[in-house]
Amino acid sequence: MMETPRDPAASRYEHAAHGLRRSDLDPDPIKQFSNWFTAAIEAQIRDVNAMSLATAGRDAKPSVRLVLLKGFDQDGFVFFTNYESEKGVQLEANPYAALAFYWIELDRQIRISGKAKITSREESQTYFHSRPVGSQLSAWASRQSEVLDGRRVLDARMAEMTERFGDKPIPLPPHWGGYRLKPDTVEFWQGRPNRLHDRFRYRRQTDDTWLVERLAP
């Protein structure tokens, strides 16, 4: 086997004794998510809105990457991206996706799965124009997931977009916008000693009712 600086199997972290009981949970997983998200913010966790996004296209080969949560409500969890990126192409072919948050400081993980839909153009525009100018320009300059012949290509495109738009308002690119993932399942995981973690899964029954189940760790 390849030698590594440290054996991955030897890396162990013993979770604290914080428990999670059924009575601790809100009947609504979105409200429960809000409670945990607020606690993570109060714990000053860096990049608290960073989440893994897993997608798979027609070939069923999964891809995963980190994206940023930009909003959530009863309709789902919102993130923004380039529609022509790998994730955008995969979501067009197969809209089912999964999200995961891991806040190690709180020994907590949240898994969410469901169907993603493109947000309205108005919602995408509102968020796009709230971004720093440099981020707006980069959405035009970067053809996400394209193979580049060096950094200079990207820098040249950025310079071109800067000159093109100047001090004028930067329009929303047609290839850029948001997705909203409406959850079918939401799982809350609380780390416990001896790997006997607490896991609760919400499964959607109707638009506004959920079945809550305790799962073996």
List where the protein language model places each region:
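Binding-site signature for planar aromatic cofactors or substrates
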Residues: 1-217
